[in-house]
Swiss-Prot record:
PTM (free text): Polyubiquitinated; which is favored by Ifi204 and leads to proteasomal degradation.
Triggers of expression: Expressed in a circadian manner in the suprachiasmatic nucleus (SCN) of the brain and heart with peak levels seen between CT16 and CT20 in the SCN and between CT8 and CT12 in the heart.
Source organism (scientific name): Mus musculus
Function field: Transcriptional regulator (lacking a basic DNA binding domain) which negatively regulates the basic helix-loop-helix (bHLH) transcription factors by forming heterodimers and inhibiting their DNA binding and transcriptional activity. Implicated in regulating a variety of cellular processes, including cellular growth, senescence, differentiation, apoptosis, angiogenesis, and neoplastic transformation. Inhibits skeletal muscle and cardiac myocyte differentiation. Regulates the circadian clock by repressing the transcriptional activator activity of the CLOCK-BMAL1 heterodimer.
Residue ranges of the motif Nuclear export signal: 91-104
Primary gene name: Id1
SUPFAM superfamilies: HLH, helix-loop-helix DNA-binding domain
Classification via InterPro entries: bHLH_dom, DNA-bd_prot-inh, HLH_DNA-bd_sf
Subunit structure: Heterodimer with other HLH proteins. Interacts with CLOCK and BMAL1. Interacts with COPS5, IFI204, GATA4 and NKX2-5.
Protein's UniProt name: DNA-binding protein inhibitor ID-1
Alphabetical keyword list: Biological rhythms, Cytoplasm, Developmental protein, Nucleus, Repressor, Transcription, Transcription regulation, Ubl conjugation
Subcellular location: Cytoplasm; Nucleus
Cross-referenced Gene3D superfamilies: Helix-loop-helix DNA-binding domain
GO process terms (BP): apoptotic process; BMP signaling pathway; circadian rhythm; collagen metabolic process; endothelial cell apoptotic process; endothelial cell morphogenesis; heart development; lung morphogenesis
């Protein structure tokens, strides 16, 4: 994948072609030429390009979030290193288990949740996790955004995770 630099992205103008000139001394922001072309075509709908320091701060914050999730989720294996995708899978399963437990306590005498789909155990998803991790690595212009919904509901509902894929 060819990578475009910040000044090449800004100087490319209104054309939507994927070709952008670069010099050897320009700073690389990690954006593919395709995503730069998409942002030129999209106009002002997309946010301005971040400088290198802002990108580093965002990456540091995300790594801190993953570390915190590793501490909070008791189902993560402690004897080996786990990928970010596997951390997210364990978080989803753990939140779902908590929701099922809350629902079963509120519905005295019944078990299960309100029609929540049955999820396969993690051991059967290892192949899918590996494939997804390869896909995420190959699509560097996409991010997964985690959003906690407790504030929107006034804290009355357990938190859940929403996943959105956005192009930068």
């Amino acid at each position: 994948m060819k990578v475009a630099s910040g000044s090449a992205a800004a100087a490319a103008g209104p054309s939507c072609s994927l070709k952008a000139g670069r010099t050897a001394g320009e700073v690389v922001l990690g954006l593919s030429e395709q995503s730069v072309a998409i942002s030129r075509c999209a106009g002002t709908r997309l946010p301005a390009l971040l400088d290198e320091q802002q990108v580093n701060v965002l990456l540091y914050d995300m790594n801190g979030c993953y570390s915190r999730l590793k501490e909070l989720v008791p189902t993560l294996p402690q004897n080996r290193k786990v990928s970010k995708v596997e951390i997210l899978q364990h978080v989803i399963d753990y939140i779902r288990d908590l929701q099922l437990e809350l629902n079963s306590e509120s519905e005295v005498g019944t078990t299960g949740g309100r029609g929540l789909p049955v999820r396969a155990p993690l051991s059967t998803l290892n192949g899918e996790i590996s494939a997804l991790a390869a896909e995420v690595r190959s699509e560097s212009e996409y991010y997964i955004i985690l959003q906690w919904e407790t504030e929107a509901t006034g804290g009355g509902c357990p938190p859940s995770l929403l996943f959105r894929r956005i192009a930068i």
